[in-house]
Amino acid sequence: MDSSKIRIRLKSYDYRMLDISAAEIVETARRTGARVCGPIPLPTKIERFTVLRSPHVDKNARDQFEQRTHKRLLDILDPNDKTVDALIKLDLAAGVDVEIKL
């Protein structure tokens, strides 16, 4: 393998699925002989939305909603061809967004 590091960034709304997926990636990479740094928790992005409860009057009655995006960072150092093949074949949860940089 030409590159000496693979950087994997995981995003999800559910931190439990995110931690399970990160553990699967770490276990797969270590099984093939690569070194792993992480999972490193990145700051959680919190988006808050305020909406009126009533469609017509009573502006003081409002609801607040929030959406949290949890992120983790993994570095796989010294990957070999078996590591890349195993990571490609890995089936992660549907609610986890995976971004890979070589």
UniProtKB/Swiss-Prot annotation:
Involved in the binding of tRNA to the ribosomes. The keyword Transmembrane helix does not apply. It comes from the Bacteria. Gene3D superfamilies: Ribosomal protein S10 domain. The keyword Metal-binding does not apply. Part of the 30S ribosomal subunit. This is Small ribosomal subunit protein uS10. Belongs to the universal ribosomal protein uS10 family. GO terms for molecular function: structural constituent of ribosome; tRNA binding. GO terms for cellular component: ribonucleoprotein complex; ribosome.
